[in-house]
C-alpha cells in the first residue's frame, strides 16, 4: 500500500527474495522452545511482529520463524493472545496520521502536508473497510483524530 498514491507505482520494486528453505538450517543453535519464549518475551515488551522478526534475524541469526515453530509469527502471537485489538499496519497509519496532523496544526500553510494527510486518511479508510469486511474490526469503527492520538501516544 505504500506505492498506492505514487506516480511510478510499478518501478523500482526489485529486492532480495526469501530463501526457499523448508527445513531448519543445520548451523542454527536454537531450538523451538527458545524461539517461542523469545517471541513471547519480545511481544510482551511491545514489539510488533515485524520488529520481532527483525530482532530474531539480526541478533539471533534466525532466518525464518516458521521453520522453527511451524507457523507464522502472526498466527503464533494470535494463538497466545498477544496481538493488539487493531492490526499493526492500521496502528502505524494512525500514528503517521497524527504526526502529520500535529505538523499541520503548527504549519497551517503547508499544503503538501495537507495533501499527504488526505492520502494517509484515504489509506486508513480503505484498510478499515477491508478489516471490517474480514471481521477484524467492529462494524461501527470509525477513524477520528482522537483515536489516532490515543495510538500515537502509546
Swiss-Prot record:
SUPFAM superfamilies with a match to the protein in the record: S15/NS1 RNA-binding domain
Biased composition (Basic residues): 1-11
Database matches in NCBIfam families: PRK08561.1
InterPro entries: Ribosomal_uS15 (IPR000589), Ribosomal_uS15_arc_euk (IPR023029), Ribosomal_uS15_N (IPR012606), uS15_NS1_RNA-bd_sf (IPR009068)
Any single GO BP term: translation
Pfam families attached to this UniProt entry: Ribosomal_S13_N, Ribosomal_S15
HAMAP family, per the entry: Ribosomal_uS15_A
GO cellular component, one term: cytosolic small ribosomal subunit
Lineage top rank: taxon: Archaea
Protein name from the UniProt record: Small ribosomal subunit protein uS15
Keywords recorded for this protein, A-Z: Ribonucleoprotein, Ribosomal protein
Assembly behavior: Part of the 30S ribosomal subunit.
Annotated region described as Disordered, given as residue ranges: 1-24
Gene Ontology MF annotations: small ribosomal subunit rRNA binding; structural constituent of ribosome
Origin species: Nanoarchaeum equitans (strain Kin4-M)
Family indicated by similarity: Belongs to the universal ribosomal protein uS15 family.
